[in-house]
Amino acid sequence: MSDCIFCKIARGEISSRKVYEDDELFAFHDINPVAPVHFMLIPRLHVASLMEADSGHTALLGRMLLLAPKLAKEQGLDNGFRIVINTGKGGGQEVFHLHIHIIGGGHIPPMVRRS
């Protein structure tokens, strides 16, 4: 998609602090990190959100989930990390190109407060 900021980053049209790239996937540091280590893993193929994914994306999604721990370890997250996929406006998605946030380092608070 020509006007998608993540597509532009994956094509090298917008600079980023690259973590990883191959023919299908691209990972880069978040410009507004919420933790000492915070990067995103995206498919080069434009898929707007997890709601748009279908069975044709199974292998791609599997590769993303299997690559995330490898990249997390390479970024120094040996003690654990969090993966977040915000989906749709109601789920907090801000950029409508499927992406996985890999977050860690320091103390990561609980996702949801238990009462």
Question: For each predicted feature, which ranges?
Answer:
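HIT superfamily nucleotide-processing domains
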Residues: M1-S115
